[in-house]
Amino acid sequence: MAAVERLTIATRASRLALWQAEHVRDLLRARYPACSVELLTLTTRGDQILDRTLSKVGGKGLFVKELETALLDGRADLAVHSLKDVPVDLHAPFELSCVLERADPRDAFVSNDYGSLADLPPGAAVGTSSLRRESQIRARYPHLVVKPLRGNLDTRLGKLDNGDYAAIVLAAAGLERLGLAARIRALLEPADSLPAAGQGALGIEILQGRADVRAMLAPLGDAATLACVTAERAVSRMLGGSCQVPLAAYARIDGDELALRALVAAPDGRRIVRAERRGPRDQAQAIGESAARDLLADGADAILAELLPTSPAP
């Protein structure tokens, strides 16, 4: 296979997205010094619509379409995504070629005045961008007011600093990647705020026909992270996972096994269905599918029927 002399990485324009793309660029440059690696910065529809929640405007696919168009028309060879933003069903001619080692998958509590969610007084406003976080906060702290929070990371922090919220809840990985870990007042353990499928991981998308790019990316992948996110995304896929569904799935490697936890919640947090499964890490897909079936059998089907036009059958 002929050596690739030039690679172009498609990325969103936010500071966090650029950090992620630059990280992949630096890894590729270090491994393939003879290859020129550059960035193509694009603005996605998801970046432009900031006055409505993702669940009301089309979901996660809004952050990838423009990058996929760049792959199709040859302007880019690969696209770097936060994996939690990548739809679980990538249709031809696209493929998720590589998953890098995961950063911290947890959610982070950020506030200028309070140390934790438990410290917030009744009626305090908490900002979050996802139904998943909202439902879990409402379940544990029904006295708090959860409000939508959109925009890039700097915009969200700015809204907190302007007094729009008493606290906000964000992905810890994004804060840490941008050197903002000092803003974190508390990390929310999975038992308290189960992460989204793929949270903290970076995924690289290419065209299925680009075997040359796939071969170059292979050494960048992390097998343990791939197993975990495969199980998590299997849960989401079977349940029609989208921004319209308060769905969480988090897997970790425990010795030779993969341990998975998943939940589906009603947006108001009054109903939460949970499932746990474990097994050999090479059975990640099956473990995720089994957990999804457990959720459906235990009542998630009723929640999904209220949220989705056509909900999955157990």
Swiss-Prot record:
PROSITE patterns: PORPHOBILINOGEN_DEAM (PS00533). Its EC number is 2.5.1.61. Disulfide bonds: none annotated. Pfam families: Porphobil_deam (PF01379), Porphobil_deamC (PF03900). Keywords: Porphyrin biosynthesis, Transferase. Signal peptide: none annotated. SUPFAM superfamilies: Periplasmic binding protein-like II (SSF53850), Porphobilinogen deaminase (hydroxymethylbilane synthase), C-terminal domain (SSF54782). Pathway: Porphyrin-containing compound metabolism; protoporphyrin-IX biosynthesis; coproporphyrinogen-III from 5-aminolevulinate: step 2/4. Its cofactor is dipyrromethane. Transmembrane segments: none annotated. One of its GO terms (molecular function) is hydroxymethylbilane synthase activity. The modification S-(dipyrrolylmethanemethyl)cysteine is found at residue 243. The keyword Transferase applies. GO terms for biological process: protoporphyrinogen IX biosynthetic process. CDD domains: PBP2_EcHMBS_like (cd13646). One of its GO terms (cellular component) is cytoplasm. Binds 1 dipyrromethane group covalently. It catalyses: 4 porphobilinogen + H2O = hydroxymethylbilane + 4 NH4(+). HAMAP family: Porphobil_deam (MF_00260). Monomer. The porphobilinogen subunits are added to the dipyrromethane group. Belongs to the HMBS family. Tetrapolymerization of the monopyrrole PBG into the hydroxymethylbilane pre-uroporphyrinogen in several discrete steps. This is Porphobilinogen deaminase.
